[in-house]
Amino acid sequence: AGTSAQQISYKYIKVVPIAGALGAEIEGVDIASGVDDKTFDEIHRAWLENNIVYFRDQNLTPAQHVAFARRIGDIHPHLLNKGLENFPEIVEVRKTPTQKLNNGGRWHSDQMYTPKPAKGTMLYSRELPPVGGDTMFSNQYLAYDMISEGLKKTLGGLKGVHNGDSRNHPSGLTRMERAKSGLGTIPQVDPGDAQIVSAHPLVRTHPETGRKALYVGSHTESIEGWSHAESEPLLNYLKEFTHRPEFTCRVRWTKGMLTFWDNRCTQHFAVNDYQGHQRIIHKIMIQGDTPF
């Protein structure tokens, strides 16, 4: 979408696109001072139009972070990660100077393995390395639009099986094994009886925009009803295809930045290029619906 058309359509905020595929900075909003309904409605529309938006120079307490997230919807509890003691809605994503692996260092959409995956994720930067630690995003509407008509038909009735604790992490360990070995960057909890393996359509329809998007990521282990050997060639192709450079944008963090993306039509990747430095991000996820 052209910037001029977008700018004309916003009265209360300024929306500055950061790439051709997706992503925009929203200017002129101080979340801590309160956001009125008209401004919030425009923020919500900018989020749907750009898939990922961010606000620089915000000075938020954890309570303000939670309150702003609740305006989007109910909080999605993280089944495998422990929240902050006084704010269980917030998961602290911390990588220390001595840790080698980071959290989110593979292309994925949050909570794909739950029956109702998080529709949105809201991250607030608390501490950053001097350089590095960017997050990359990929537009899954575009990925779907660009596959052939034949492949669209093939994918139409298929579901992907997503596992929240598989060994397809770079370490070769499950989450619980990483936590016990000190490789995890977030305190882990045992999910108990909670469901962390779910099947969802490989092509999902966005409930608010009506657009179709590919829904495949690093959590996707197989295609429902197919063997792993049968699933692997198609899934490997899709996993590579979904983050072609022309579908992506790259967000460079600054301290006090709030970034908010739509998990229903994007994937993201946390770049692990700041060894020897600390990075602390506060993460809240918004409850979604069953993908269809």
Regions found by a protein language model. Name each.
Residues 1-258, 263-292:
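Non-heme Fe(II) oxygenase catalytic core, chiefly the N-lobe of the double-stranded beta-helix
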